[in-house]
Amino acid sequence: MRILYCASEANPFCGSGGLADVAGSLPHTLCRKGQDCRIVVPLYGTIPQELRNSLNFITNFTVPVAWRHQYCGLFWARWHDCTYYFIDNEYYFCLLY
């Protein structure tokens, strides 16, 4: 089965609560059971630099939003046998809290 797991946060890349714990562990369990599970999360500014260094650039494009066009970058990384995709947009995701 092919599964695309989308979440606002996933450990170890970004997380502040229970959702990050589930999104960081459930897909890995599915991968270990032979499923093709991939995870999509925002590329937050709070992701540690050592993890950011493991990201691979795929492409970038613009997305029409009302009267303007917003940049969107797409990156990927492998972590514990799962593929993560990261959506980059500093306007929305550069949260340095």
List the predicted regions and their residue ranges.
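Conserved small/polar residues in nucleotide/adenosyl-binding loops
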Residues: 97
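Beta-strand-turn-beta hairpins that frame and shape the catalytic cleft
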Residues: 76-85
